[in-house]
Each structure stands twice: as structure tokens, then as C-alpha cells.
């Protein structure tokens, strides 16, 4: 595990490997996992069947079509933790800073700041339709401006379980390199747990 994980940290990155490999890794990490209530923003292995992501339907789903950088690839106006963009490590390209979104929401989120992106993730991970319909008031409370097109996109988005761990964070929490690195470690452990069973059993 240690040898594999060391290599995966360096090579299982958005700019270092094929996008299909990254998507597979994100789906494997989301499969049967739940938010870690002791570590905000992280996930842990849940019960069998609690979050089914390793399926052809999920692979082909338009809701999981594109890879989203949570802290964007370009740190405009230094809105994000600068250490994520260290040129020697580039944590912003690692699995812990990536998730899956539909193409339209990914494009809309773009280079937005943490508060706005969090609102997107909270909408997609929301199970209560009444909270989705109240998106404008939620945005106003966070000091976030949403145009009518974005509001409609969010209202029409389908529920996605894999964003639950991020959606439980608050606008006052920090999306920084420490969290991203810990997310990457956790996700790689889970991926190894899944894949090693196929390789060695």
C-alpha cells in the first residue's frame, strides 16, 4: 500500500494521467462511502449499498461527466490558499481537490470563490426540495450573487451523494492544502481497498 500510495500521490493527478483514470478513481472513492463526522470534509467507508457509484450507470451518467477542481486551476485574486498552488507539489491537481459535476454546473462554477462553490455543492447534495427552492435566500445570506440562469441550473440539478462530505462544511471553514492533502490520503486508502481486492483475491 505505501509504495502504491506514494506513486499515486505523484501520478494520480489531473494533469498527470488520463481523465478517465481520474474519473474512475473519484467513483471508486465515492462508492459506499459516507461523510466522516469526526473530520469535516473527509469521507470514510460506509455500509454496503449506502452509496452505489461503481456501476455502468454512474460511469455513463451526465451528472458525473466532468472533473471539477474545487479550488480552481487559476487562483484569481488570490481567493484560495496559495500553498495549494506550490509549483513543486500542486495539491490543487490532486484527487482531494477534485470532484465530479455535470458539464453545465462545472462551467458555471468556474473560478468562483469558496462561498459560491460551496453553495453549488450544497444544492447538488441536498435531499430536501424545499431547501433547493430557497436557493436565492441562501445565496443572499452568504453574500453570494447568483444570476437567474445559475439559479435555474441549481434548482434543476439532480441529487448526488458524493458531494455530501463537502456540503457539510460551512462558508467559514477553510478549503486549504492541509484539508486537500488529508482528503487525498483518505481517498487513496479507499481506492486501494477497492482495487486491491480485484487484484489479489
Language model regions located:
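Long, cytosolic, alpha-helical-rich C-terminal regions that act as interaction/scaffolding modules
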Residues: 91-94, 98-99, 103-201
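Intrinsically disordered, low-complexity N-proximal targeting/linker segments that flank membranes
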Residues: 1-80, 84-91, 95, 100, ...
Amino acid at each position: 500500500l505505501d509504495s502504491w500510495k506514494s506513486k499515486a500521490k505523484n501520478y494520480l493527478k489531473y494533469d498527470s494521467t488520463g481523465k478517465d483514470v481520474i474519473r474512475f478513481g473519484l467513483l471508486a472513492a465515492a462508492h459506499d462511502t459516507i461523510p466522516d463526522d469526526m473530520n469535516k470534509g473527509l469521507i470514510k467507508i460506509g455500509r454496503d449499498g449506502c452509496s452505489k457509484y461503481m456501476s455502468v450507470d454512474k460511469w455513463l451518467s451526465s451528472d458525473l461527466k466532468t472533473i471539477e477542481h474545487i479550488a480552481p486551476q487559476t487562483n484569481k485574486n488570490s481567493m484560495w490558499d496559495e500553498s495549494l498552488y506550490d509549483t513543486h507539489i500542486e495539491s490543487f491537481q490532486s484527487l482531494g481537490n477534485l470532484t465530479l459535476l455535470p458539464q453545465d454546473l462545472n462551467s458555471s462554477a468556474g473560478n468562483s470563490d469558496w462561498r459560491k462553490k460551496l453553495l453549488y455543492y450544497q444544492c447538488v447534495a441536498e435531499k430536501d426540495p424545499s431547501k433547493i427552492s430557497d436557493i436565492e435566500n441562501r445565496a443572499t445570506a452568504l453574500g453570494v450573487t447568483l444570476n437567474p440562469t445559475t439559479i435555474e441550473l441549481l434548482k434543476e440539478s439532480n441529487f448526488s451523494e458524493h458531494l455530501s462530505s463537502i456540503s457539510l462544511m460551512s462558508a467559514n471553514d477553510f478549503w486549504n492544502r492541509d484539508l486537500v492533502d488529508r482528503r487525498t490520503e483518505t481517498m487513496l486508502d479507499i481506492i486501494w481497498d477497492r482495487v486491491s481486492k480485484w487484484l489479489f483475491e
